[in-house]
Design a protein with these regions (language model features):
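Flavin (FAD/FMN)-binding glycine-rich loop and adjacent Rossmann-like elements that form
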Residues: 1-9, 13-170
Length: 170
């Protein structure tokens, strides 16, 4: 249930500005126009495939997903050859609001659906002997809500190693 917490200072390390939003502080997300504008990372899903010594027939029921027919239909999908016991695949799923529970639920569902679409492509089209090993239990959120502070850190600040008097960590 609800709790009351008291402290002189709170440091919001939730990654989604949850504490700041709950306390009524100003937050921002995206560029104010789109959920994942260019230059920002959309949520991503990691999953791992096991390589089988024998051919693997497609595992998925048709009709639940839209079949991927060519590599061009795999945007924002990365395959690493050195996953645990096989391959590791990361796919990004843009266009959802991670601060809204209904949108976040839809994102979780779409990410898993997309995971199976990609797996089906590798099994059916590429004839890869891969089976699903395991996947991340939740989507990886990268850039959702952030605290609207007095100053926004820039790439140049990071590259220059700029220091700030009010830094939280050193």
């Amino acid at each position: 249930g609800p709790e009351a917490l008291q402290a002189r200072v709170f440091v919001d390390c939730t990654g989604e500005a949850c504490v700041a939003r709950t306390a009524g502080f100003a937050t921002a997300k995206g560029d104010g126009k789109t959920r994942n504008p260019p230059g920002q990372l959309p949520p991503s899903m990691m999953y791992f495939l096991r390589e089988r010594p024998e051919p693997v027939p497609p595992q998925l029921v048709e009709g639940w997903f839209t079949p991927v027919t060519c590599e061009e239909d795999l945007p924002m999908t990365s395959v690493w050859p050195d996953g645990p016991g096989g391959k590791a695949i990361k796919l990004k799923v843009p266009g959802y609001d991670s601060t809204d529970t209904e949108s976040l639920t839809a994102l979780e569902i779409r990410a898993r659906q997309r995971m199976f679409e990609v797996l089906d492509y590798f099994q059916r089209v590429q004839k890869k002997p891969w089976r699903l090993g395991h996947c991340s239990p939740i989507i990886g959120l990268r850039e959702g809500a952030r605290i609207a502070g007095d100053y926004m850190l820039t790439v140049d600040d990071v590259r220059a190693g700029r220091e700030f008097d009010d830094a939280v960590a050193r």
